[in-house]
């Protein structure tokens, strides 16, 4: 095991609070725009996005695309491999292809299986990614998750320093307290020398992951500093769940993936899987 891989293994085993960084990504390349009758490839996997660490992902429990007319389509996803450069090993992931047949805003929605996390909690991940196809919907659409971010800013077409305004809903009501986390998906694995440092030379974790408290009505505002993919995360304790023969605290964890365009013509290339132009 490479030395740097041992460093990250130590960090995530002995500092479990950092495990909030475990995310399920649901992204397409080069961005979240589509065209009529043009096939689009999506990638599904697990990662510590800020560090560019790729992890294995259990088979998703449910995956569907919410179409502009309110109906759903269930694409067939296939198991594939992504490459984790921290340990120089292959990781289990998935991809699927989707061809838009309608103009308007689509939502790609995913529900994970129950996952035992490093901090000895069980999580169920509820993930959504907007796909814009030529025409803007008048009303925001939702996947219908128990925990979900409702956008008050159009969730696509962002550029650097763009601002997003949203509201968190839990069981059909605005969430009255909590926090959201905003994290950039690094297109490359960040080696130790690449990580941001504070004035004492220690890894600057707050710089990598921004956190914002919710208002009493569940509202929040965030901005995106870099072009590429970002994930907004919120989690809520929802009782306990038996996993194996033991009970663990159970959390619903919701991700909203947002793409930010560059001011320049070049696009981010993610080294974990082969870039595609469709």
Model-assigned labels for residue ranges:
Residues 51, 113-120, 238-244:
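Short acidic/polar inter-strand loop motif in beta-rich domains
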Residues 65-66, 70-73, 184-196:
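Short aromatic-acidic-glycine turn motif
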Residues 37, 92, 99-108, 116, ...:
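Short tyrosine-centred short linear motifs in exposed loops/low-complexity segments
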Residues 21-41, 120-190, 244-278:
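Beta-strand-rich domain onsets/edges
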Residues 81-96, 206, 210-219:
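Aromatic sugar-binding surface patches on proteins
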Residues 21-82:
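Start-of-domain marker
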Residues 189-217:
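Short, acidic Ser/Thr/Gly-rich low-complexity loop/linker segments typical of extracellular
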């Amino acid at each position: 095991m490479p030395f740097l891989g041992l460093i990250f293994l130590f960090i995530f085993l002995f500092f479990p609070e950092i495990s909030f960084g475990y995310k399920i990504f649901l992204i397409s390349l080069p961005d979240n725009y589509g065209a009529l009758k043009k096939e689009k490839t999506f990638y599904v996997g697990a990662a510590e996005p800020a560090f560019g660490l790729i992890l294995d992902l259990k088979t998703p429990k449910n995956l569907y695309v919410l179409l502009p007319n309110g109906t759903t389509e269930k694409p067939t996803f296939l198991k594939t491999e992504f490459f984790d450069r921290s340990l120089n090993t292959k990781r289990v992931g998935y991809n699927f292809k989707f061809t838009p047949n309608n103009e308007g805003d689509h939502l790609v929605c995913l529900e994970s299986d129950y996952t035992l996390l490093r901090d000895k909690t069980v999580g169920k991940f509820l993930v959504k990614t907007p796909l814009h196809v030529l025409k803007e919907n008048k009303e925001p659409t939702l996947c219908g998750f128990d925990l979900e971010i409702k956008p008050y800013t159009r969730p696509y077409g962002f550029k650097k320093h763009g601002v997003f305004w949203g509201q968190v809903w839990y069981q059909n009501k605005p969430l009255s307290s909590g926090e959201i986390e905003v994290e950039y998906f690094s297109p490359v694995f960040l080696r130790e020398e690449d990580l941001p440092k504070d004035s004492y030379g220690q890894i600057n974790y707050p710089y990598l992951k921004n956190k914002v408290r919710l208002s009493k009505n569940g509202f929040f505002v965030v901005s995106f500093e870099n072009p590429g993919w970002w994930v907004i995360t919120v989690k809520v304790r929802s009782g306990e769940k038996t996993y194996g023969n033991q009970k663990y605290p159970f959390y619903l964890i919701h991700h909203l993936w947002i793409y930010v365009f560059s001011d320049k013509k070049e696009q981010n290339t993610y080294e974990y899987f082969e870039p595609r132009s469709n």
